[in-house]
Design a protein with these regions (language model features):
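Electropositive polyanion-binding surfaces
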Residues: 1-208
Length: 208
């Protein structure tokens, strides 16, 4: 049976952006939100991206929710999906969560589930690595920009925290649960997969 229960909720954008609408066509044309050092060019209007579809603290928001149950080895055993309404209890930062995981403090006291989340993320990571998953952990550059002039004043390596990895593991687990559900239902759906490497190219890699 399940001994861990992971809940993931994402904003229900489809409630506001109907298929074929002007908003839908514009979002298709843009394809993405674009993040710059000092600004963001959103895929959707700000009233949605930073308002009605943003999970702000202490405000009711429409979501698509998912519940995944794991056994004590991190193997998924149950899953359920449903529309819902949530009220976020706080907007946390990666740095704040990492501080709470490492040293406790006020944030850890207000959100005691963070240590449970850390333990589950470690379990999922270990299981994924045992399955042969690769983690390149490539360095990411962070640009230091003068907000007055727009000029780049420096570049430094962005620090990758376990808080980042925690969210990565949970979103991977959530996406895999959706994929399993659709596969079991025989529902046609585009999957983004990483097939096994070509043996010749793999041999070349090892020689270099």
């Amino acid at each position: 049976g399940a001994v861990w229960e992971l809940w993931v909720a994402i904003a229900d954008v489809s409630h506001f952006v109907l298929p074929g609408s002007r908003l839908d066509r514009e979002a298709r044309d843009r394809g993405n939100s674009y993040y710059f050092p000092t600004s963001v060019e959103p895929m959707l209007p700000e009233v949605l991206s930073n308002g009605l579809c943003s999970l702000r603290p202490d405000e009711d928001r429409l979501v698509m929710a998912e519940r995944v149950g794991f056994d004590d080895r991190g193997i998924p055993r149950t899953s359920a999906f449903f529309p819902g309404v949530i009220r976020s209890r706080g907007r946390l930062t990666y740095e704040g969560v990492q501080e709470a995981l490492d040293h406790g403090g006020e944030l850890a006291g207000r959100h005691p589930y963070l240590k449970d989340a850390e333990a589950l993320a470690h379990l999922l990571l270990e299981r994924r690595q045992a399955r042969g998953s690769l983690d390149f952990d490539l360095p990411e550059a962070q640009f230091i920009v003068n907000r007055s002039t727009g000029e780049v004043e420096g570049i430094k390596r962005r620090v990758r925290l376990f808080a980042h990895r925690l969210i990565e593991e949970f979103m991977l687990a959530a996406n895999e649960a959706v994929a399993r559900f659709l596969t079991e239902k025989g529902t046609p759906f585009p999957y983004r997969i990483h097939p096994a490497p070509d043996p010749d190219r793999l041999s070349t890699l090892f020689r270099t």
